[in-house]
From Swiss-Prot:
It is found in: Host nucleus. The keyword DNA-binding applies. Belongs to the DNA polymerase type-B family. It catalyses: DNA(n) + a 2'-deoxyribonucleoside 5'-triphosphate = DNA(n+1) + diphosphate. It comes from Canine adenovirus serotype 2 (strain Toronto A 26-61) (CAdV-2). PROSITE patterns: DNA_POLYMERASE_B (PS00116). This is DNA polymerase. It is an enzyme of class 2 (transferase).
Length: 1150
């Protein structure tokens, strides 16, 4: 028994037994206050009492009294870190403060205090010093007040936080950890995870530097319906105000795909009076011929628009049949039909049924650089009669004179959509119907050239097609449409000058004679030629779909994937998708992105990483005619071999761990003359560096690094200042004798580990290529070679802040961004004006007299109607004989259309920073760094023995260096056979990096080989004029003494008119200051998509003649050692273009 105090004055009484307080430990217990109340009213001892069970509490848990004083840590507006302690109860705190200082609470402070009226109340209270601290997201903005006539003797300090006002008790100084953001007074210990989180998600300067890369499996829903419209056009030259413009006069197309979609398209083609080629409907080849300008585009647009409408109606009918309740929903909303629902309204309803996924492709060869541009002004419009219930998304992207994207998607909600929780099927490349939020109809433009990178003629051979491309006398067709006739031979066949050569002329004439079709019909022959091109392209489409599906199934080992190579527009985008799929399968991140395995630099970091991407070398070190043997060596699959090496992986280190990693590099460079690229103590990184070269006599003509400081990319032996370089380049420079200093830079990036991210991708492509060689499968060999070479380019993709939109695509969010200045309109282009209904007002001239102060009265406008005989000039206004001003009005076209129908805008972000969540650009930087390591090792084979000898006294060993090749003299050839034999492919060796035995892995082979015996051969004489402008006279075999043909390269010139002798004569004419001028001319097609130039019409292809002068290198980026030899710039021979000032801190002055 225990004694308890009663609430009255009666003293103590015994507490009766309370079974409630003796429950099991798992049951709730009464708090002390409730127990006291329960027994305060109970009878005293001896009295009969009844125990009443108290009501159960609604909430369980500990009851915590609110603290009287709270605190926050923040950074003041002057950068000082502080801790602010404040009272949680403003009213009582103010009262206590005033009472402590022997004041009553001022009436003004007794009113409700808010963040808005606080400044006025402070001025009314008139404290000698007052302070308001406005707190927001870790920072404090201070506003101070000082009363001229104080009414109080103590200061007032307030804190405004989340719209509430508090009284500050104390402000004390603090310190802030720069690595994890924690505040502390004396000492502090932070955790690794907190440091990483702060750096990547909290710190204002670095939180947006790295983005996770989204992932989508490479497959497509297995029940996807597809239709391919394979087409080709033929053009003639039309001379207009914009020059020689190419105008289509013929279009042929063939239909492939699912039968029901093909039948719909065939019915539409018949209804719209498309002619059937050769009268064979089963071939599904249709054509139209008309020389009328833009008529072909209008007819093809009508066909594509009508097809869109039919397929959209089919999909909507499918949805309505499965969801009849939509009619009732529409009626409830006051709509006549469910079609009038908006996409947002439809998303609110729960749909039922099976989704449909429909894809329609317009396919051709080289159409994104030619055909689609000619037709774009007619076919790019989205103004088809599509029900408004569809959500429309357009991806229109012109780039480098080509239509990279021209896709339209009409989507509806997918009733089967379920957010993915398990990603095992993603690892196998599968996309299920439940993975997609929308069912859709996609209309896409695809170019087989972008997937094969070769001409249609070569593609037919490379992919083993049963038909081949024909020949057409284009110029004869041009003259026929321009002049009405063309030159013919005695048999009425187009003259020899219209054909490529005598062989082509004879071959096609023989075919024509054998066909015995009578007189040569140039239009019919052109139609047959165009139809044959379409047939070849159609076979190529089927071959690509089938072959890539087999490649993904067997070589990539994804047997369940439904892969469609046309789902992505280019071979580069397909290679990148396959790479990500292989990486996703290997790493199993179990999410919708690649996690932290591989991240993309963004905003400020994107620019920093891009600065570390340095292109390949390409320059001659000898100018003129060289009359001694030259061998050409080429690195075998340079980018593919580089891609098998380790690359940076993981989320970049925070500044603390980064500093430790940098220290490891500095210690290694200080203590070791040579560092291994595969030292486990060194992590991958991108640094800002200074580098000083060794003494002049220890340099060579193959520098390990290049610089853009002079305005042009230049391989130089000069000191490097403030360059952005990878850790591989740091090691390369150090091993070549350069003194490298890592400069402190907040953007310096170090990654936590090395990984062979692309090794499996390259390995499977090499294996597929070798297997194809064994089985003589030319198609698989072509696919494997293309995919192997294309991956590097996808990593190096350069993004910009521009996008092209149509007026009808500018939605409210884009309009707000333009209004706020986030986007600016760089240019606007107008198209289709020739096809819209228009009323033209002819040219007219109006003469106006100058203002005359004597004219006071105007004649009534109807005076001539009242009296036709009265002279209207008898009264004012009338024309005097003094000088007048004439205004000439040009014809005015009034177009019956809205600007949204034909206005195209190019928008650009106002910020120079580029957001990137797609491409890991650091991989491209490291790929090039590995190739520089290859060439650095190569240079050691040739020049290691020359160390200490001045450059002018050395034997000539190499004369030209390209990205992946080197031209050596006989002396250089001997050194390769002796010191570089390990790297010669003919001696065996690996092309794929082996992680278990890490070493640089690359091979070279002699490109100049004897065409008879296959031995290494040389060119007995060669001439070098400039980068990418050289010629080898022949290929001489030292074994069998066979002399084969040479090699010529002249980038930008018409090589058909050049030869070794022409280049040689050009060099001698320039050296002897002769009067001969050497030029080359070739036809060039100028492609214009969007333009702000008045003399250029958007969406046109114009034909121009490009003439270039042939001459030796004038603006050299090397120093001339003598009349022929060139050497890189150095301290002794600095680059004259370098005008940039570099500020350095001299140690002896600090």
């Amino acid at each position: 028994m225990s004694l308890v105090q009663g609430h009255g004055t009666s003293g103590l009484f015994t507490e009766p037994p309370n079974p409630i307080n003796q429950q099991e430990s798992s049951g709730p217990s009464l708090p002390a206050q409730d127990a006291a109340q329960a027994f305060a009213s109970s009878p005293r001892a001896g009295a009969t009492s009844t125990i009443v069970n108290p009501p159960k509490r609604k909430y369980k848990g500990a009851v915590v009294v609110q603290r009287a004083t709270l605190s926050i840590s923040a950074v003041l507006d002057n950068g000082q870190c502080v801790e602010i302690k404040y009272h949680s109860n403003l009213a009582s705190a103010l009262t206590n403060l005033c009472n402590t200082n022997l004041y009553d609470l001022p009436a003004c402070l007794n009113r409700p205090i808010t963040a808005h009226n606080l400044p006025a109340l402070i001025e009314e209270a008139a404290a000698p010093y007052s302070l308001i601290c406005y707190y927001q997201r870790g920072t404090v903005r201070r506003v101070e007040f000082q009363a001229e006539v104080p009414l109080l003797s103590f200061p007032l300090k307030f804190l405004v936080k989340q719209g509430k006002v508090f009284l500050i008790k104390d402000i004390s100084q603090m310190q802030k950890c720069e690595f994890c953001g924690s505040f502390f007074k004396v000492t502090h210990t932070c955790a690794l995870r907190r440091r990483d989180f702060y750096f990547h998600h909290v710190a204002a300067h670095s939180a947006d530097w790295w983005e996770k890369i989204s992932f989508t499996p490479i497959g497509a829903p297995p029940n996807t319906e597809r239709l391919f419209i394979v087409y080709d056009v033929e053009t003639y030259t039309w001379h207009g105000k914009f020059g020689k413009q190419l105008v289509p006069f013929m279009l042929v197309f063939q239909l492939l795909g699912d039968d029901h979609l093909v039948n719909v398209a065939k019915t539409l083609a018949t209804e719209q009076n498309w002619e059937i080629w050769n009268g064979k409907e089963q071939d599904t080849l249709y054509y139209c011929i008309t020389p009328e300008k833009r008529a072909i585009g209008v007819k093809f647009k009508k066909f594509r628009d009508t097809l869109q409408q039919h397929i959209a109606a089919s999909l909507w009918s499918h949805v309505i049949c499965q969801n009849p309740q939509l009619q009732e929903k529409a009626t409830t909303l006051g709509l006549e039909s469910p079609e009038e629902l908006t996409p947002d309204q439809l998303k609110k309803f729960k749909l039922k049924g099976n989704p449909r996924f429909i894809e329609v492709y317009a396919v051709g060869h080289n159409i994104t650089g030619f055909d689609e541009i000619l037709l774009a002004a007619q076919v790019v419009s989205t103004r088809a009669e599509i029900p408004p219930v569809f959500e429309i998304c357009r991806n229109f992207m012109p780039r480098a004179g080509r239509l990279l994207f021209n896709d339209i998607t009409y989507s509806l909600p997918n009733p089967s959509y379920v957010p993915a929780k398990s990603y095992e099927h993603w690892e196998q490349g599968q996309v299920l119907a439940s993975d997609l939020k929308s069912q859709y109809i996609k209309f896409m433009v695809r170019d087989t050239f972008s997937l094969t990178h070769t001409s249609l003629k070569n593609a037919a051979k490379a992919y083993s097609l049963t038909v081949s491309k024909g020949c057409c006398p284009y110029q004869a067709v041009n003259e026929f449409y321009m002049l009405g006739s063309y030159q013919q031979d005695a048999d009425g066949f187009p003259d020899l000058k219209y054909w490529k050569d005598q062989e082509e002329y004879s071959f096609n004439k023989d075919l024509w004679i054998k066909e015995k079709k009578g007189a040569y019909d140039i239009i019919q022959q052109t139609l047959d030629y165009c139809a044959l091109d379409v047939q070849v392209t159609a076979q190529l489409v089927n071959k690509l779909i089938e072959s890539y599906q087999i490649f993904i199934k067997n070589s990539v080992n994804l047997p369940e994937t439904s892969f469609n190579v046309f789902q992505r527009p280019t071979i580069s985008s397909n290679s990148h998708a396959i790479f990500k799929q292989i990486l996703y399968k290997a790493e199993k991140p179990n999410t919708h992105h690649l996690s932290t395995i591989l991240m993309a630099p963004s905003n400020e970091m994107y620019e920093y990483v891009r600065l570390s991407i340095r292109g390949g070398r390409c320059y001659p070190t000898y100018i003129g005619v060289l009359q001694e043997p030259v061998f050409v060596y080429d690195i075998c699959g340079m980018y593919a071999s580089a891609l098998t090496h380790p690359f940076p992986a993981g989320s970049p280190l925070n500044p603390y761990e980064r500093a430790l990693a940098i220290k490891a590099y500095e210690q290694k460079m200080l203590n070791h003359k040579t560092i291994s690229y595969f030292d486990k103590d060194l992590l991958p990184g991108i640094f800002t560096i200074d580098a000083d070269p060794p003494a002049e006599e220890f340099l060579d003509v193959l520098p390990p690094f290049c610089s853009r400081k002079g305005g042009r990319l230049c391989w130089t032996n000069e000191p490097l200042r403030g360059e952005i370089a990878t850790s591989i380049d740091v090691i390369t420079l150090h091993n070549r004798g350069w003194k490298v200093t890592l400069i402190p830079d907040t953007r310096t990036t170090v990654f936590p580990e090395w990984k062979c991210l692309a090794r499996e991708y390259v390995q499977l492509n090499i294996s597929a290529k070798e297997e194809a060689d064994k089985s003589k499968n030319q198609t698989m060999r072509s696919i494997a070679k293309l995919l192997s070479n294309a991956l590097y380019g996808s990593f190096a993709t350069k993004l910009d802040n521009k996008k092209t939109v149509f007026s009808d695509q500018i939605e409210s969010n884009i309009a707000k961004e333009i209004a706020s200045g986030a986007y600016v309109v760089k240019s606007s282009s107008y198209i289709e004006t020739d096809n819209l209904c228009a009323e033209i007002m002819p040219e007219f001239v109006v003469a106006y007299p100058p203002v005359n102060s004597d004219v006071r009265q105007l004649a009534p406008p109807s005076c001539s109607e009242e009296d036709p005989t009265k002279d209207p000039l008898a009264e004012a206004p009338f024309m005097h004989n003094f000088s007048m001003t004439s205004y000439h009005y040009k014809p005015i076209m009034f177009i019956d259309a809205e600007d949204d129908d034909f206005c195209l805008h190019t928008l650009e972000k106002s910020t120079p920073l580029i957001a990137n969540n797609r491409y890991p650009s650091q991989i491209a930087s490291f790929v090039l760094a590995w190739t520089r390591a290859f060439v650095s090792e190569w240079s050691q084979f040739l020049y290691e023995n020359d160390a200490g000898t001045p450059l002018e006294n050395r034997v000539l060993k190499s004369v030209y260096g390209d990205t992946d090749s080197l031209f050596t003299t006989m002396e250089g050839y001997k050194l390769m056979e002796e010191k570089g034999k390990k790297r010669l492919k003919k001696n065996g060796g690996k092309l794929v990096f082996d992680p278990s035995n890490p070493e640089l892995t690359w091979l070279v082979e002699c490109e100049t080989q004897c065409e008879k015996c296959g031995s290494d051969a040389y060119s007995s004489e060669s001439v070098y004029l400039a980068p990418k402008l050289y010629a080898l006279k022949d290929t001489t075999c030292p074994k069998c003494h066979h002399v084969g043909k040479g090699k010529l390269r002249a980038k930008g010139h018409a090589t058909s008119t050049l030869s070794y002798d022409v280049l040689k004569a050009c060099y001698y004419a320039d050296m002897q200051q002769g009067s001969d001028v050497f030029k080359t001319s070739r036809m060039s097609l100028r492609r214009t998509l969007t333009s702000v130039q008045a003399h250029v019409q958007p969406f046109t292809v114009t034909e121009t003649t490009l003439t270039r002068k042939l001459r030796p290198w004038k603006d050299k980026t090397l120093h001339a050692l003598d009349m022929h030899r060139l050497i890189p710039y150095s301290r002794k021979h600095p680059n004259p273009r370098n005008t940039e000032t570099t500020w350095m801190e001299l140690q002896w002055m600090t």
